[in-house]
């Protein structure tokens, strides 16, 4: 008996999605209620505060993106911010998907003031990244930084054999939940997400990731490496248009700002 093998694309299967029309709700702004703590900025005490929000500083319940090329200074800026928040008694977490313990230790030796930042080395939990992050985030934090989105999504896809789209939906949904205080201590968590840019200067991620954040910050470095800057192309919490220049030396980060529309 000769067996035959069917070739071509597999037959599409219809997926039945249950929908309850009674679950759909409409709101007016007057219907919404949140704590007034949403309007209390978390300040760094640096020039960064000017472009982070109109009030001056990072606002609670916000998710922002820091995007830039390799070596532009993204991780350094974020760790510098987190160290200043930690020293004020805020509860922060740095989720490191790229650096391991040795790399982070060397980083702290070069910049001693960041060694106070509580850090999760996500590579140690790559087989259960979903469960790990959901457990840790539920502890409640003022600020959580993700370094980087690309690494978290890749770990999720590998661990659960799923698609980029499914990984993004989980990732964005998790942040949305905790922004709104959906954790054991009702923190309106702010997320600072790090993402790479390609050598051509394009965003290395989907449009969904780019547009579903409250603020998008570009971190740049000149070809000769002498000038670094950051500016927001989108920031729902700030009405100012400034570019902040920064340099890294003597174990610290030093900032100065200028209006973005001035000639460089």
Where are these regions (language model features)?
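Phosphate-binding/switch region of NTP-binding enzymes
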Residues: 176-264
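The Walker A/P-loop phosphate-binding site
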Residues: 2-7, 12-111
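Short, flexible loop motifs at catalytic/binding sites
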Residues: 19-24, 29-31, 137-140, 151, ...
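A short acidic, amphipathic alpha-helical/loop segment
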Residues: 81, 132-134, 173, 205-208
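Catalytic-core regions built around general acid/base machinery
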Residues: 81, 166-183
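Short loop/turn elements that form and flank the Walker-type P-loop nucleotide-binding site
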Residues: 59-60, 88, 138-140, 186-188
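Conserved inter-motif catalytic segment of the P-loop NTP-binding fold
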Residues: 69, 88-173, 259
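Short beta->alpha connector loops
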Residues: 72, 126-128, 197-200
């Amino acid at each position: 008996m000769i067996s035959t093998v069917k070739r071509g694309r597999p037959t599409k299967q219809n997926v039945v999605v249950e929908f309850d029309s009674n679950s759909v709700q409409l709101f007016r702004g007057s219907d919404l209620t949140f704590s007034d703590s949403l309007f209390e900025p978390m300040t760094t005490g640096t020039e960064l505060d000017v472009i982070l929000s109109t009030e001056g500083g990072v606002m609670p319940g916000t998710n922002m993106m820091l995007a830039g090329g390799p070596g532009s200074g993204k991780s350094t800026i974020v760790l510098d911010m987190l160290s200043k928040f930690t020293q004020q008694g805020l509860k922060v977490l740095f989720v490191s998907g790229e650096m391991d313990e040795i790399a982070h230790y060397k980083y702290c030796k070069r910049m001693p003031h960041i060694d106070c930042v509580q850090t999760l080395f996500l590579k140690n939990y790559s087989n259960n990244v979903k469960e790990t992050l959901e457990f840790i985030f539920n502890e409640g934090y003022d600020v959580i930084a993700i370094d980087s989105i690309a690494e978290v999504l890749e770990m999720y896809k590998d661990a659960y054999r799923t698609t980029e789209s499914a990984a993004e939906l989980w990732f964005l949904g998790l942040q949305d939940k905790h922004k709104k205080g959906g954790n054991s201590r009702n923190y309106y968590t702010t997320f600072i997400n790090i993402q790479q840019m390609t050598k051509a200067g394009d965003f290395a991620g989907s449009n969904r990731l780019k547009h579903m954040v409250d603020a998008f910050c570009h971190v740049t470095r000149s070809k000769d490496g002498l000038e670094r800057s950051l500016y927001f192309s989108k920031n729902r919490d700030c009405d100012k248009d400034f570019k902040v220049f920064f340099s890294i030396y003597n174990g610290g980060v030093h900032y100065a700002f200028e209006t973005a529309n001035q000639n460089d």
